[in-house]
Amino acid sequence: INKNNIFYSMIIKNLKKNNRLDETELFGPILNVQKFKDVEKLKKELNSNNYGLSCIIWCSNKKNSEKFINNLRYGRVWVNGNITQNYPQIPIGGFNWSGIGRETGKSAIYNYSEFQSTIINKI
């Protein structure tokens, strides 16, 4: 493996807005930490991203976290948890460029199904 392809575990914080890291779908041990004051402004910034596979939120106030995740465009959101908490009954899949369809959970069955709608009018 080329050394340039290896990401060592890292925590990145206080990045300036519109940086490359925020506009890339990363798979690896990289944590981008951002503090925020305005929940709606941060949600708008996150939803403007082209990717939406997963998001982890750490918040000391339950009401703030519930307010934050409402209408957030990510396929899976953890609040005060991490990606090692997986439940097979919950669908996995992303929004935007992060994938089409869902894996695991009941909704995954729809990927292997064909539906037909039939409308019968009275005679």
Predicted ranges, named:
Residues I1-N2, N82:
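Short, solvent-exposed loop/turn elements at beta->coil junctions and helix N-caps
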Residues F7-I123:
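Conserved C-terminal structural/oligomerization subdomain of aldehyde/semialdehyde dehydrogenase
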